[in-house]
Amino acid sequence: MITVDDATEILNRFSLDRRTYVELKDSFGRVLAEDIVSEIDVPSFDRSDMDGYAIRDQDLDGRRFKLVGEMHAGGDLEVAIGEGECSWVATGANIPDGANLVVPVENTEKIGDDVIVYEPGKEPHISERGCDMKQGETVLKMGCIVNDRNIGILAALGIRNVPVYDMPTVAIISTGDELARINDVNSITLSAIVAQSGGSPVFMGTATDEISHVKHKIKEATKCDIIITSGGISSGKKDLMPIVVSELGGVLFHRVKMRPGMPMLAGMIDEKPILCMPGNVTSCLVCGHVFLPPMIRRMVHLPFAGLGGVRRARLSEEVVSEYGMRRYLPVKLVDGVAYPTFKGSSLITSIGHADGMVVIGEEETIRKGEVDVQVL
């Protein structure tokens, strides 16, 4: 039997450094696989920040200017101004040749073809070409996570296909003859954890307890980067996964010092990791939350510090744990109090109603009072 930490270390040896391109609209949350270097100046022209009149600042000794043109945002009309002249400019419009100052419209008065400037102000109200981003500038670094803010930088540069680290494909198989009579829960819950962690779940269907059927399903699943199964890893006659993994590849560990989830098995087939979760729904979910996020997030170059974070709470009751086993206790949080929800590893509501888990270490047997809750 292996500790949780040792099992995690073994699984973290698997890596993935595959890169791909995704459309800009699909890049949110992905990790950049290369530096983003601007190929253009942004803005690409001297741009007005205000509605008003563009003039030459050296002409400010006079307060009356002759209106010689209009510039609108998106327009392609070219205007040049000389001594004592001005041009109307809209916000976002190109600055006319010769102008270096925009007087806000509220500080002026138009009289016929003339414009009177009452108060020019202290700011030029012009965004110069390249003041936001310059051609050749590295604007985002490799390893940066695309978020709701810097995705705007990519859009401003006109980037339509974004270089990112590829998501690992994760094959999911539930095993057991009983799945012909009951609903398959584990495939659904595991796929949600995979997606939340940054992977791409691939449903492979269910397998019966016939060893040939299980082998066929797993061989088919080796097209993916990771294989996950549930069921068939305890000590019953139909618990075939240890045999199947040994014959198709090799077992890395079997049984982990944790509850729930102790029967957990991991191996390697065709250089691909295979994680065999317990069939009991809460045990399966706990193993999924413990082992999948750190492994998958490493593969997509995302940081991992617990997906939901940690909250401090007070246990509603004293909890007894088995010495030498790390216990993951599902709890519901209400007004700073953590109420245990565990009713049995085979019952989905044991974790389905939980907001997080309290981890009780291998050296502890009793836990009470203030605790850290790993939010799910």
Language-model features, listed with the residues they occupy:
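Flexible glycine/proline-rich
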Residues: I2, T8, T20, E34, ...
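Predominant activation on well-ordered alpha-helical scaffold segments within soluble catalytic domains
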Residues: T8, N12, D51, V105-E106, ...
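Helix-rich terminal scaffold detector
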Residues: M1-V4, R160-M277, V281-C287
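Short, glycine/charged-enriched hinge/interface segments at domain edges or termini
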Residues: R13, Y53-G205, A338, F342, ...
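Short amphipathic
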Residues: T20-V22, D26, K66-L67, V139-K141, ...
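Intrinsically disordered, low-complexity, positively charged segments
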Residues: M1-R64, I145
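Short, hydrophobic/aliphatic alpha-helical segments
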Residues: F28-I40, D76-W88, A266-G267
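Solvent-exposed alpha-helices and their adjacent loops that cap or buttress functional pockets
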Residues: D46-S48, D59-L60, E78-G82, I95, ...
